[in-house]
């Protein structure tokens, strides 16, 4: 028994048995996690079983597995595939006649990180849609362009909904003293043609004024971009970060007019960074908005223009494979906020 347990899990027999107790020591957990990070499939299976627990340990382990799956935590090159396959096996067990009503399998019958990972591994389309319905409910795309329906949950070209983008960006800056992020808006109201950014800025200025670094997530029709108001040498500046084709002049003018409400006196104080970063990140504008906020929240007092321009230029030097990996991992990291 000792030899078998040690060869499979790199744990002693007492350490292995302790996994079934209410409290698992940090030492045993660290040993198991180390093996998981190295791609040990037996340990991955074991950790996925621990993640089923509906207590602090179960939630901690489930989060750790998702961090490895989403690339937030580094592991062996194929770690995400090993983890989601292990979750898929558990999902199949959870849905057989014996266990389907067992509360111990609750995380595989309701929105959870484990269920999301299982769904990503499912190749059967009808089962994939069934899992997506459990996670999202009956959410459908409003237009052909807004690909937010359940059938597209794991699609590498899926457009994020406003609620998903809001959940991720608000969660991201919850503890950041540097940024204030507003709920995503459209630039122009589709029927009244009102400039919604202008309206939101007027409300902000009337209530509490703008923060030192105030972010607006703006949709120009079928595309998300970042609008940042910040102070530089006691002067209000505005930065637009657009990761697709250059905006048309009408759209730029609408943004410039709105910026005047915040105290921008000259149009040259509105800086447009426009580079197409989306060749290998289809419908990825919202992903870049999320990542931009991540960069800005970690940039401290650095000039945001320099920070974002350097990121964009560096991103364009990445290989196709590296850009595709950014697409996959960022989508997973963003959707995690909708699972909490």
Swiss-Prot record:
Keywords for the protein's UniProt record, in alphabetical order: Host cytoplasm, Hydrolase, Protease, Secreted, Thiol protease, Virulence
Enzyme superclass (EC): hydrolase
This protein's name: Deubiquitinase SseL
Gene Ontology CC annotation, any one: extracellular region
Single GO term (MF): cysteine-type peptidase activity
Function: Effector proteins function to alter host cell physiology and promote bacterial survival in host tissues. This protease targets the host cell ubiquitin pathway by acting as a deubiquitinase in infected host cells.
EC number: 3.4.22.-
A matching Pfam family: ElaD_SseL-like_N
UniProt subcellular location: Secreted; Host cytoplasm
Positions of the catalytic residues: 223, 285 (nucleophile)
Keyword RNA-binding: no
GO BP terms: proteolysis
